Regions:
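Cell-envelope and extracellular/periplasmic
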Residues: 54-56, 60-62, 67-78, 107-113, ...
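Mature catalytic domains of secreted/periplasmic carbohydrate-active enzymes
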Residues: 97-103, 159-162, 173, 181, ...
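Serine-esterase "nucleophile elbow" of acetyl-processing enzymes
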Residues: 38-108, 123-130
């Protein structure tokens, strides 16, 4: 059996920093687009084709302050509608690299949401778009809100996984040709993230990975990425509160998302 290179062995300090489009100019961007820059992160799949609709879904990490103005959110490739986070930066990278492909990219992340809240709005905010590629990043609120007694949320990892499976099954029934991307929930050990998150948070990550595997989705291991990133800059550099990525964190996510979908 051929083994994938490990995260730590595949990346030198220089190689890792080259994968960040923040770090360097044109030469760095060229290096970042090569498969050699991060072989452990490439899924080997080519998900994005011409004239496709790409939809980002999730919570505040995806939302990233996007506009709620219908004219802006219903227009593809619109910066206010895409927000200020990784979804916008991933869209920008796709649109720079594939200017003639007619891609239409949307963001429907909503701050604070958990899996069951995605399900409540799924018809209008996902299925009606008929996306060709759907990317979901969800899970941090499913644990975070359960840790805050003031919110009185009684969620568990079992509820999270059950609801996630149901959401994906519903989506794949409605859109049988859909290409699905499941992003790994992640946190960094700073800010709002304390020891009480663990080891339970790792169970949520494992659940998301099982959902991806069962439904043949491309899995984007963001936690693995940030676990390497903190070797070269402190956690606060990537996400000041441990949950919401900084500009550097969002840019790193965007670049590796694009790598993972083979675009």
């Amino acid at each position: 059996m051929k083994h994938e290179p490990s995260v730590t062995s595949a990346l030198s300090r220089r190689g890792f920093l080259k994968t960040s489009t923040l770090a360097l100019g044109t030469a760095g961007l060229a290096a970042a687009t090569s498969a050699e820059a991060a072989p452990w992160f490439s899924s080997g799949r080519k998900l994005v084709a011409k004239n496709q609709v790409i939809l980002f879904q999730g919570d505040s990490i995806t939302d990233a302050g996007r506009s709620r103005d219908k004219e802006k959110t219903n227009a593809p490739n619109n910066q206010p509608g895409l927000g200020n986070g990784y979804a916008w930066l991933a869209a920008a990278e796709l649109l720079v690299g594939r200017p003639d492909d007619g891609l239409k990219i949307f963001n429907r992340g909503i701050s604070g949401h958990k899996v069951f809240q995605l399900a409540d709005r799924w018809q209008a905010d996902c299925l009606d778009f008929k996306p060709d590629v759907l990317s979901i990043l969800i899970g941090v609120n499913d644990i975070w809100h359960s840790l805050d007694p003031k919110l009185n949320y009684k969620g568990t990892v079992e509820i999270y996984e059950r609801d996630y499976h149901a959401l994906v099954e519903r989506t794949q029934r409605a859109l049988p040709k859909l290409k699905l991307v499941v992003c790994e929930p992640f946190v960094l050990r700073c800010g709002a993230v304390s020891d009480k998150w663990f080891p339970e948070f790792d169970r949520y990550r494992a659940a998301a990975k099982r959902v991806a595997a069962q439904h043949h989705a491309t899995f984007v291991p963001f936690q693995a990425m940030f676990d390497v990133a903190v070797k070269y800059a402190p956690p606060e550099h990537w996400a000041g509160d441990g949950v919401h990525p900084s500009p550097a964190g969002a840019a790193l996510m965007a670049h590796f998302w694009v790598k993972a979908v083979g675009a």
